[in-house]
Amino acid sequence: MTQFASPVLHTLLDTDAYKLHMQQAVFHHYYDVQVAAEFRCRGDDLLGIYADSIREQVDAMQHLALQDDEYQWLSGLPFFKADYLDWLRDFRFNPEQVTITNDNGKLNIRLAGPWREVIMWEVPLLAVISEIVHRYRSPEMGVEHALATLESKLGEFAQMTESVDMSRFRLMDFGTRRRFSREVQQAIVKRLQQEPWFVGTSNYDLARRRNLTPMGTQAHEWFQAHQQISPDLATSQRAALAAWLEEYPDQLGIALTDCITMDAFLRDFGPEFAQRYQGLRHDSGDPVEWGEKAIAHYKKLGIDPLTKVLVFSDNLDLSKALELYRHFSARVNLSFGIGTRLTCDIPQVKPLNIVIKLVECNGKPVAKLSDSPGKTICHDKAFVRALRKAFDLPQIKKAS
């Protein structure tokens, strides 16, 4: 390996919590389901030149395995069953599931294989891409620059919150996927642990080593896959919500609302789901409008919003989180997940706007429509039309 290509990843647990939570549900319910996922760069970065370095990292990932102390720690958490953890012990990344090409400067990546295995690629692979790119672009930058920026922002935040009751403010690190580096994320989390309102991280490795609560439930792919798993497209979102409760009847009960749109989600989120799920997560669209809709929905169902949690995780920074806290904190419980603005907030460093999203399940198309234009992902325009029709949405947005 070149000096720039020392391994980015050192443990299987250097991933987001929702990946393991979803993987266990897939292991128990959808063991044989096949999927395909694709990489997207939402910015104008030409990342194809890094294809060989990324390939090198992907090939090295086959050597990652769950260690005994990690297995013991996971066994002590309330989420996991023994059969899944025993299987996870034997899990190895299969680099043959990953196709990486440089298409005239554009980076193309496609993942394909059993869902129970492919599900594990997204977060560490995005972290690899982000770190490799930053190693080449900003080799002189690192932990001290990230911490200096954070200290400055925490100072401003302390001034902004002097006269605010912060007792109900909860903030989590959601920064694994687009971090500057593993070391930067670790340093940021360590510093944030000094703040009374910092409650956890989405990163399982950091949660274990820093004695933090691992945070995360499910992602868009859980709902997307059900578009083909469920026999009826119109009820696929309800099927996804029900299957999640089968796996986790009394915990991990935060539901992601924007795979189709918030309005379509709320039509499916009836009294039983609303009672049983602990809350909802916002990931696209106007956050204030979304929060007001959520609170109104709970009230309409006769549920006190103060018994529920709204999690905001879309493009947040500290000041945006504070704005939302001031707006909503008297009416509902709140948590804020901040990613890129914590773990890749360094002067002169441009964070990457990169994602990996499901595009097929069992050989058929799936889609994410979302509440933000430009976040729609699907190759098959006819399927997008069918999805919009099934969920009673106007035929306006084009698939990208």
UniProtKB/Swiss-Prot annotation:
Gene3D superfamilies: nicotinate phosphoribosyltransferase. Its EC number is 6.3.4.21. It catalyses: nicotinate + 5-phospho-alpha-D-ribose 1-diphosphate + ATP + H2O = nicotinate beta-D-ribonucleotide + ADP + phosphate + diphosphate. The keyword Transit peptide does not apply. The modification Phosphohistidine is found at H220. Transiently phosphorylated on a His residue during the reaction cycle. Phosphorylation strongly increases the affinity for substrates and increases the rate of nicotinate D-ribonucleotide production. Dephosphorylation regenerates the low-affinity form of the enzyme, leading to product release. Belongs to the NAPRTase family. This is Nicotinate phosphoribosyltransferase. It comes from Enterobacter sp. (strain 638). The gene is pncB.
